[in-house]
Structures are given as C-alpha cells and as structure tokens.
C-alpha cells in the first residue's frame, strides 16, 4: 500500500509523488491504462512502474499483474481505490470548476515512460529502495 505517512526526502509523500508521476507520464504518452494494455507492456518488459488498485474485484487480474511484475522485478505499488486511480490517469471528464466528473475506475496502470526527470520520480524510486 502507498502509505500516506511515509515521506521520502521530507517534501512529498508517496501518494502525491505517484499522482505527479502518473500525470507527467500521461502528458508524455507513457501510460498503459487497463489490464490489457498493462499486461502487454509488462510482458514486453517495457514497464518502469506498475500501479494496481487494491479493490480490484477480479482476483485473477491481481494474480496476473503480480506475476508479470515479479519475474522481471518491476516495481509494483498498490493504491486503495480504482476510481481514484482512474481519476489520476485521466479517465474522467473535468467540469467548469475543475472537479472530476464521470470517473471511470481503472484497476491497473503501467508507466512505460516517465516523460522527464522530476522530484516526484525520485521520491517514488527512493520509496522502492527503502521498501526492498
């Protein structure tokens, strides 16, 4: 789980860093969203990072993604809600006030390209170094 309380570097927590990394990767067309795209990217070993929703209702999806991440040792991070993950990766409409509407749940996202170097990317990498 991406703990709210852990702050690598003392500036940004892991969830905030994850949102930044996903947003940057989305802008640079470096995301594979959904189980099919994610499985393809993981199988081809194009992935740098995999994000899986903990509330995924299909246990076989979870097993597949965990297995595909385990063999080549791709970093896997779990978030608690698929709707939140869907919002973070742009699977929603934004209304006039800037609030997300019609959010589509997303159970799995793979970052194929970070886009650019950032503090958020460093925080995520530091999180996995500490975790290992």
Swiss-Prot record:
Transmembrane segments: none annotated. It holds the Pfam family Ribosomal_L7Ae. It comes from the Eukaryota. Belongs to the eukaryotic ribosomal protein eS12 family. The keyword Repeat does not apply. InterPro entries: Ribosomal_eL30-like_sf, Ribosomal_eL8/eL30/eS12/Gad45, Ribosomal_eS12, Ribosomal_eS12_CS. One of its GO terms (molecular function) is structural constituent of ribosome. Its main location: cytoplasm. Keywords: Cytoplasm, Ribonucleoprotein, Ribosomal protein. GO terms for biological process: maintenance of translational fidelity; ribosomal small subunit biogenesis. This is Small ribosomal subunit protein eS12. It is found in: Cytoplasm. One of its GO terms (cellular component) is cytosolic small ribosomal subunit.
């Amino acid at each position: 789980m991406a703990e709210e309380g852990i702050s690598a570097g003392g500036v940004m927590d892991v969830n905030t860093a994850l949102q930044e990394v996903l947003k940057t990767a989305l802008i640079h067309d470096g995301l594979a969203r959904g189980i099919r795209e994610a499985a393809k990217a993981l199988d081809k070993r194009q992935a740098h990072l995999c994000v899986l929703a903990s509330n995924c209702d299909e246990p076989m999806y979870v097993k597949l993604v965990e297995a595909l991440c385990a063999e080549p040792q791709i970093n896997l991070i779990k978030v608690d809600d698929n709707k939140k993950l869907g919002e973070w990766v742009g699977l929603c409409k934004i209304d006039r006030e800037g609030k997300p509407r019609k959010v589509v749940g997303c159970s799995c996202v793979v970052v194929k390209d970070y886009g650019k170097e950032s503090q958020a990317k460093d925080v995520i990498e530091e999180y996995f170094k500490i975790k290992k």
